[in-house]
Curated annotation (Swiss-Prot):
InterPro entries on file: Chaperonin_GroES, Chaperonin_GroES_sf, Chaprnonin_Cpn10_CS, GroES-like_sf
Subunit structure: Heptamer of 7 subunits arranged in a ring. Interacts with the chaperonin GroEL.
Annotated protein name in UniProt: Co-chaperonin GroES
One Pfam family it belongs to: Cpn10
Presence of keyword Cytoplasm: yes
Species per Swiss-Prot/TrEMBL record: Methylovorus sp. (strain SS1 / DSM 11726)
Gene that specifies this protein: groES
Keyword Transmembrane helix belongs to the record: no
GO molecular function: ATP binding; metal ion binding; protein folding chaperone; protein-folding chaperone binding; unfolded protein binding
Keywords for the protein's UniProt record, in alphabetical order: Chaperone, Cytoplasm
Biological role: Together with the chaperonin GroEL, plays an essential role in assisting protein folding. The GroEL-GroES system forms a nano-cage that allows encapsulation of the non-native substrate proteins and provides a physical environment optimized to promote and accelerate protein folding. GroES binds to the apical surface of the GroEL ring, thereby capping the opening of the GroEL channel.
Length: 105
């Protein structure tokens, strides 16, 4: 069983953040925040305009994307936590050369 999003919806699997700091301190689950980066695992067909034309989505399966902390709806499928959000809630696509982003304090 899999999930097929409708219209402009995108299914994202969160990419887990590093659990250890640069100095070697382990961050417990209770203190860590949910990651705001993930990989697109499924997309809908696109957004339908008022005149009936369909606009395809910009993101595709396999893209690494950034999204807001409170974006989308969390769902569980086969014990795995996934995020379903609208394409407009995606802030950007992480290009291959930028894949290792560092959080600025």
């Amino acid at each position: 069983m899999s999930i097929r999003p409708l219209y402009d919806k995108v299914v994202v699997k969160r990419i887990e953040a590093q659990r250890t700091t640069a100095s070697g301190i382990v961050i417990p689950d209770t203190a860590s925040e949910k990651p705001e980066q993930g990989e697109v695992i499924a997309t809908g067909n696109g957004r339908r305009l008022q005149d009936g034309t369909q606009v395809p989505l910009e993101v595709k399966v396999g893209d690494q994307v950034l999204f807001g902390k409170y974006a989308g709806q969390t769902v569980k499928l086969h014990g795995e936590e996934l995020l379903v959000l609208r394409e407009e809630d995606i802030l950007g696509v992480v290009e291959a050369s930028d894949a290792k982003l560092k959080k600025v304090a």
